[in-house]
Amino acid sequence: MTVRLESVTFTSGDGETSVPSYLATPERHGPHPVVLILRGVAGPDDGYTEIARGLAEWGYVALVHGWKVRGADPTDGPVYADLLGAMTFLGSVGQADLKRLAVFGFCRGGVHALMAARAHAEIRVIVVFHGFAFRPARAQRGAEPYDLAEGVSVPMLVLHGTEDEQAPIADMRRMEARMRALGKVCTFTFYDGARHGFAVRTHPGYAEDVARQSFDEARRFLATHLRT
């Protein structure tokens, strides 16, 4: 499928900050379901624009959120404001069907995905790749991934490597157990030997075979929970 990838800028919900981002859209007539991509901290944008292009080839409108304009470790307030700006921007994209909206979170973007789903009822699905880099003790109370996830009611798919250096497998197993105990619609898939960043081509931890498997699983999850 022919797709269009372009640089875009939207205004944060604070009404002041410009957030440079990327938008990928299918060329065929819409409206199309939407994926908001919340990138990780490390690496250039190229790996994420490739992911956006791939999603557009599947038939999704995809926005790579440029949250790094805030720096590598922003506080929660600006993140929420920028997420609001992204939602407003997507509402202006003619081909975007916000009744079918998913969020992909990578690394720290996994935490932001949980924040987004708690704040915006339009979000119907979350997919997290090597995410939930657990936050330092200085993080505000209730802001750990465990706590954020408890307030999420939409289906969530978590794709994680057993050798992740940023979000250790033991932490992820505990999170999986907590989500199950709470009765959440949440699927965890662990890839033996995969490191942090396995799904992003420009990341040092990239693993082509694991990336392909994880995106195949994400595509099936979207087809089940979002396409209808």
Regions found by a protein language model. Name each.
Residues 7-96, 138, 144-145, 197-203:
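Serine-hydrolase catalytic machinery in alpha/beta-hydrolase-like enzymes
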Residues 95-106:
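Alpha/beta-hydrolase fold nucleophile elbow
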Residues 103-105, 129, 159:
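Short beta-strand immediately N-terminal to the catalytic nucleophile in serine-hydrolase-like folds
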Residues 105-109, 113:
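Gly/Ala-rich beta-loop-alpha elbow adjacent to hydrolase catalytic centers
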Residues 122-133:
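A conserved short beta-strand
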Residues 152, 158-160, 164:
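Short beta-strand/loop motif that positions the catalytic acidic residue
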Residues 165-171:
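Conserved alpha/beta-hydrolase "acid-adjacent" motif
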Residues 182-228:
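C-terminal catalytic histidine-bearing segment of alpha/beta-hydrolase fold enzymes
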